[in-house]
Regions:
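Carbohydrate-binding surfaces of carbohydrate-active enzymes
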Residues: 7-11, 15-184
Length: 184
């Protein structure tokens, strides 16, 4: 969906964030998540809700890796730094059956509160308490990068003389990286 087309009928913008951390190019994963957060914030020019995140490992990627220590806190604070008013989870308690029984959760099958994942979720909550004055605030961007979802779809679906090496999203990310490089 092109969320911008729904901005006038939405009460709140939310999205589900499941970056593929712990790959060779970690920086690009971080930049992509950052760009997606900024896109969500730009829809209504106000804070959004991070509706779903996973404190440990997902169940549906080619390789499902447990986040390294501290990574969940970093990813959560990244969302807040880019306009999220929340860090919410799918799922609170790990499912008993079906495919999501292998999807990470705040409370795993063991059920205790003495796991690393549970401790790290607690750390996120404590960090958010310390910065609660940021809730509802927004920032004014100094630069803009246009991401046209319909253009992305059109290029992805093109059937013509050149069908390879047309990477719209990667081109937008490259421009986005150049802009954030200037900001830091």
């Amino acid at each position: 969906l092109d969320y911008k087309k729904f901005k006038d009928v939405l009460d709140v913008v939310s999205w589900d964030n499941y970056p593929s951390w712990h790959k060779k190019e970690e920086y690009l994963t971080a930049v992509d998540a950052e760009m997606q957060h900024d896109l969500m914030r730009s829809i209504r020019k106000e804070p959004f809700l991070l509706m779903e995140s996973c404190p440990s490992a997902t169940n549906w990627k080619p390789i499902n890796k447990l986040k390294k220590p501290g990574m969940h806190l970093a990813a959560s604070l990244q969302a807040v730094a880019h306009g999220s008013d929340s860090v919410l989870y799918f799922q609170l308690r790990q499912s008993q059956g079906a495919s999501e029984k292998f999807h990470g959760a705040v409370i795993d099958h063991y059920g205790g509160d003495d796991t690393r994942v549970f401790r790290e979720v607690t750390e996120v909550g404590e960090a958010l308490e310390q910065i609660q004055e940021t809730v509802g605030t927004s920032m004014r961007s100094q630069a803009a990068v246009l991401y046209d979802r319909e253009n992305d779809w059109a290029i992805a679906d093109v059937q013509g003389p050149r069908n390879v090496d047309m990477h719209y999203r990667e081109a937008v990310q490259k421009n986005y990286r150049a802009q954030i490089g200037r900001a830091h």
